[in-house]
Amino acid sequence: MPENPSSSPTEPPEQSAAFEKWRSGLAQFTGLGLSESEKAERERLKAQGKLAKDWDKCEGWKRDLMNYSPMITFLLNHLKLAGCPFPSSAMQCHPCPENRAGGFSPDHGILLCQDRFFNKKHMEDTLAHELVHAFDHCRFKVDWGNLRHHACSEIRAANLSGDCRFTREVKRGFYAFNKQHQACVKRRAILSVLANPACTSPEMAERAVNEVWESCFTDTRPFDEIY
């Protein structure tokens, strides 16, 4: 009499391996059934993938803006004319904290916060803002530890870059129609000066901005007028 077949036959090795690959892939996709170490590795790989994706997008937008944005190409050209050519390598894409989109350092160039841009237009405004700082540093030898110097460059950058256009202000929750642009420029300049290590109070930041307001708000170099 023939033997009864086993109630739990052993799968062929290749079928078992295929099932395990499918199970592992599903677990990685859903996060279900993973050990704590596997979950940690999954999150690490996801974060790594997002960093790479954000960096690729930031670099692509940067390349497009450097080639096709009238605002950015204008500023880059005037930096070159002023004796301070600004290559692509001086504009670095990196992840940042939530409260910033970019930055300028005389020693390191421009920081573009790859994970903080709503869209390419936001990045264009940010890059223009930082390039105005770069232009000021090149042309006017700004002492960034001097609050009046810093305030002047922040006024000019906020005024000229598009950072204070009406649509940007609406997104921030500011809806004033009367002198909205001036109010935005002053507010954002004060906030930036307040972050200067040499500034010890909001009153000091506001005073520095007010002291240079008239001359710096009307100074549109290298533009003929507000863009």
Curated annotation (Swiss-Prot):
GO MF assignments: metal ion binding; metalloendopeptidase activity
Keywords: Hydrolase, Membrane, Metal-binding, Metalloprotease, Mitochondrion, Mitochondrion inner membrane, Protease
GO biological process: mitochondrial protein processing; mitochondrial proton-transporting ATP synthase complex assembly
Any one GO cellular component localisation term in the record: mitochondrial inner membrane
Enzyme class, first EC level, given as a word: hydrolase
Pfam families: Peptidase_M76
Catalytic residues identified in the record: 130
Intracellular or extracellular location(s): Mitochondrion inner membrane
Similarity annotation: Belongs to the peptidase M76 family.
Entry protein name: Mitochondrial inner membrane protease ATP23
Gene: ATP23
